[in-house]
């Protein structure tokens, strides 16, 4: 019964647990995620902005809501469905279409870094381009020719960009 909202609920538990630890500076918690993880991290940043110092989303799957709507169009959802090799319950599509991620992320005014390949066929870069127009304080780094999932050189670049972003934005 996995969905973006169940993953978000799991992340909320982790965030609360981290904030309760004496050794953790709860004013400096950064979220990062790739693909659906970037979507979920963005959702948490938008719904609980006071808990998030910074956000890094790498090829975030903002397309998944449109994909779910297309799968639902003109038919009743089956109890389970195989999507990208995963057997998912209908809650996956129901939860994905129950809100608009762009309405959520506009609530996060902290620093955000999006990293996306220009040749991503799974999640077209236009979704991240739209997101940086919606986030109050976001930057998009486009990696020329990169697809969904980076090769080693592009992955290293994304890691270095992410680390630099955290260093620049930590309190």
Explain the meaning of each model-derived region.
Residues 110, 124-133:
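Short alpha-helix in the alpha/beta-hydrolase fold that links the catalytic acid
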Residues 24-33:
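Alpha/beta-hydrolase fold nucleophile elbow
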Residues 47-91:
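Hydrolase active-site cap/lid region
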Residues 146-157:
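Catalytic histidine-centered segment of alpha/beta-hydrolase-like enzymes
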Residues 33-37, 41:
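Gly/Ala-rich beta-loop-alpha elbow adjacent to hydrolase catalytic centers
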Residues 87-104:
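Active-site nucleophile elbow and catalytic-triad environment of alpha/beta-hydrolase enzymes
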Residues 108, 114-116, 120:
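Short beta-strand/loop motif that positions the catalytic acidic residue
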Residues 2-21:
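Alpha/beta-hydrolase active-site loop
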């Amino acid at each position: 019964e996995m969905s973006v909202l169940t993953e978000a609920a799991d992340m909320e538990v982790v965030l609360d647990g981290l904030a309760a630890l004496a050794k953790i500076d709860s004013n400096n918690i950064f979220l990062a995620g790739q693909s659906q993880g970037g979507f979920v991290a963005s959702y948490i940043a938008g719904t609980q902005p006071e808990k998030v110092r910074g956000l890094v989303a790498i090829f975030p799957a903002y397309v998944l809501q449109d994909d779910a709507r297309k799968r639902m169009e003109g038919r009743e959802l089956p109890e389970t469905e195989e999507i990208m090799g995963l057997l998912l319950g209908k809650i996956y599509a129901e939860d994905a279409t129950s809100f608009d991620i762009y309405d959520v992320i506009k609530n996060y005014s902290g620093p955000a870094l999006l990293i996306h390949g220009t040749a991503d066929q799974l999640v077209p870069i236009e979704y991240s381009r739209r997101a940086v127009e919606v986030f109050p304080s976001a930057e998009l780094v486009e990696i020329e020719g990169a697809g969904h999932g980076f090769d080693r050189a592009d992955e290293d670049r994304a890691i270095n960009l992410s680390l630099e972003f955290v260093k620049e934005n930590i309190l």
